[in-house]
């Protein structure tokens, strides 16, 4: 049986205990747009294993690399979302996520046509592999076998 890492199965309290942080800290990260909580019909926040890894990475950026929330948001705003949504085109040029650097694309209001009516939690941009060690690859382009062959 495969585990769906995107399935929201962890409560906010469980995530807080696993990361040894306060529930309020997780809520603050959510308010800042660094994480997208799934909310049940009753408003209970739930998180996936993918969200847990994203939060671990955020904590690492803060505690080990000295970044603040603003710096993390700016860095996330550099993720080339169009690469995950079918490539750069005229629609992308009109999208505020392309020319704004205020935060990750899932925090932008009035997004372009490619992202209208899309559940951001299910979007490939939000679901990219979370790894603090690979953030440069995500921002500056995927490491591909073609690039490796060209360097040989």
Label every PLM stretch briefly.
Residues 2-12, 17-18, 36-42, 49-152:
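Arg/Lys-rich, alpha-helical DNA-contact motif
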Residues 22-25, 31:
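Short coil turns linking two alpha-helices in DNA-binding domains
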């Amino acid at each position: 049986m495969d585990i769906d890492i995107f399935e929201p199965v962890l409560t906010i309290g469980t995530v807080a205990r696993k990361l040894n942080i306060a529930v309020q800290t997780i809520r603050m990260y959510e308010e800042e747009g660094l994480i997208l909580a799934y909310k049940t019909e009753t408003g209970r926040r739930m998180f996936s294993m993918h969200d847990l890894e994203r939060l671990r990475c955020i904590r690492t950026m803060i505690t080990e690399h000295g970044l603040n929330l603003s710096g993390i948001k700016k860095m996330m705003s550099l993720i080339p979302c169009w690469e995950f949504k079918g490539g750069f085109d005229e629609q992308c040029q009109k999208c505020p996520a392309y020319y704004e650097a205020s935060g990750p694309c899932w925090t932008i209001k009035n997004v372009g046509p490619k992202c209208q009516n899309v559940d951001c939690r299910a979007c490939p941009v939000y679901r990219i592999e979370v790894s603090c060690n690979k953030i440069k690859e995500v921002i500056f382009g995927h490491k591909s076998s073609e690039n490796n062959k060209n360097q040989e």
